[in-house]
Structure formats: C-alpha cells, structure tokens
Amino acid sequence: MAGVLKKTTGLVGLAVCNTPHERLRILYTKILDVLEEIPKNAAYRKYTEQITNEKLAMVKAEPDVKKLEDQLQGGQLEEVILQAEHELNLARKMKEWKLWEPLVEEPPADQWKWPI
C-alpha cells in the first residue's frame, strides 16, 4: 500500500487506519484462534470460521484498499475493522458462555408458542 489514501472517514468518531490490511489480518487471525477453542460441531464456530476465512483470504489477496472495500461489502475498511473487533469480542463471549452445552433445565413447553 502506498500510504494513506484519505484524511478522514467522514464518520464521527471513526479515525482513518494507516495500516488496514495489517489490522484486519491480526483481527481475523485472533478470531480464528478463539474459534479453535470452541467445539467443531458448534454452529457459531462453523459459520463464523467460514466467513472469517473468506474475509482473511480477501485481505491477503487484494492490496488495493478501494477494491478490498468493494469485495468485503462492509463499508470503509475502518468500518470493517470495527466489525471485526466486535466479532472478536463476541467470539470470546461465546467461548465463555459455552452456548454449545445443553441447557441447565428444560424450557417451558409453550415457550415459543404464539399467541398464547
């Protein structure tokens, strides 16, 4: 990358990232590391791992910022970085919550019935 292409994101509170490719590579790698600690059969791991690997491959393959933004379809790369940070936080919480384990007690029979 030949340097910063813009001076502002135009979004209040969201600063320009000077090294978006590096930042995204780090975040996606951290997400994948956390997902490794979740059982392979857990739906969250399966789908998040697939999406994260696809995005990481795009980041590694496309050096042009604008083209990468178009491929990722998540707005500006700074917005994609913010999304990746949120996904990393969620992955850590999912690991902590152990949502793949069975419920402590059975839900009420009509819990999902509507109208009651």
UniProtKB/Swiss-Prot annotation:
One of its GO terms (biological process) is respiratory electron transport chain. The modification N6-succinyllysine is found at residue 98. Pfam families: ETC_C1_NDUFA5 (PF04716). Keywords: Acetylation, Electron transport, Membrane, Mitochondrion, Mitochondrion inner membrane, Respiratory chain, Transport. It is found in: Mitochondrion inner membrane. The modification N-acetylalanine is found at residue 2. It is a peripheral membrane protein. Transmembrane segments: none annotated. GO terms for cellular component: mitochondrial inner membrane; respiratory chain complex I. The modification N6-acetyllysine is found at residues 30, 46, 60, 98. It comes from the Eukaryota. Accessory subunit of the mitochondrial membrane respiratory chain NADH dehydrogenase (Complex I), that is believed not to be involved in catalysis. Complex I functions in the transfer of electrons from NADH to the respiratory chain. The immediate electron acceptor for the enzyme is believed to be ubiquinone. Complex I is composed of 45 different subunits. Belongs to the complex I NDUFA5 subunit family. This is NADH dehydrogenase [ubiquinone] 1 alpha subcomplex subunit 5. It comes from Pongo pygmaeus (Bornean orangutan).
